[in-house]
Regions:
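Aromatic (phenylalanine/tyrosine) cluster motif
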Residues: 4, 20-23
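Short, positively charged and aromatic/hydrophobic N-terminal segments
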Residues: 23-24, 30
Length: 254
């Protein structure tokens, strides 16, 4: 993307600017150190894909029966998509739901590919639908990726709970980075998908339309920091962290 080094810092916090180098080093799938999942003996797989020019983290959750949920489909380039397809085909995973933490272009530029292949429900908060529809303004490959009507079929208007492959999942509303921001929490596994709300050592940027610094701080402090301290946090950019580490070391709270 033209001007990437200038655009990249606008989308997420200070700590995530390093994702540019992460992206260059590994345009590939990434196995996660899912200690919280493994030590409970549960049967849930989680795979991370670091994709597009922003080093966005797309997450695939899949159960023993092959049911899969995709969080923040950011696949932009053919090689990224082909690598993802190879992964799900080898494991016989079928996507049953597409979830989005928010509507920024780096988190939605793969939505069209997913919906074309699986024709599954697409869930996102209604407040971020305008961001989704603004995607073509980015031009180039991003405009082509989000062409057509990609409006979500499910609107996350409250804090609902549902079950995926026998595993409860909670939707936590966390406005601030965007007005429609949400995080997804697996209580049995004690794992949080934080999108661009909370990063390792940083938080999401709030100087874009719809951003609100005070609101973001409150979302993290009142909702995310209420989770167990050993909760594993899987963010939308960068490396995993824990609630305890961010309470203790994150410069916005420590």
């Amino acid at each position: 993307m033209e001007g990437f080094l200038g655009v990249c810092p606008l989308l997420w916090g200070k700590g995530c600017q390093q994702c540019f180098f992460l992206y260059l080093a590994r345009r590939m799938t990434n196995d996660l150190a899912m200690e919280n999942v493994e030590k409970k003996g549960v049967t849930l797989g989680v795979q991370r894909f670091v994709v597009n020019d922003f080093g966005e983290c797309t997450y695939l959750l899949y159960g023993e029966g092959g049911e899969g949920i995709l969080i923040d489909a950011g696949f932009l380039y053919d090689e990224e998509w082909e690598q993802f397809i190879d992964f799900v085909e080898k494991r016989r995973v079928t996507i049953s739901l597409l979830l989005n933490t928010h509507g920024h272009i780096d988190h939605v530029c793969g939505v069209g590919r997913v919906l074309e292949r699986w024709k599954v429900p697409f869930a996102m908060h209604s407040a971020d639908v305008p961001l989704l529809l603004q995607g073509p303004q980015f031009g180039g490959a991003y405009a082509r990726a989000v062409k057509g009507d990609l409006r979500p079929s499910i609107l996350l208007e409250s804090d609902p709970k549902f079950t995926f492959a026998g595993h409860p999942m909670e939707i936590i509303r966390t406005p601030g980075h965007t007005q429609g921001g949400c995080c997804f929490y697996l209580p049995e596994e004690n794992v949080l998908f934080s999108g661009d709300t909370l990063f390792e050592g940083s938080i999401g940027r709030t100087d874009l339309p719809g951003g609100d610094f005070s609101q973001l701080i409150a979302s993290i402090r009142d909702k995310l920091f209420a989770l167990p301290e050993d909760c594993l946090v899987l963010p939308g950019h960068g490396e995993q962290t824990t609630i305890a580490k961010e309470q203790r070391e994150n410069p916005f709270f420590s």
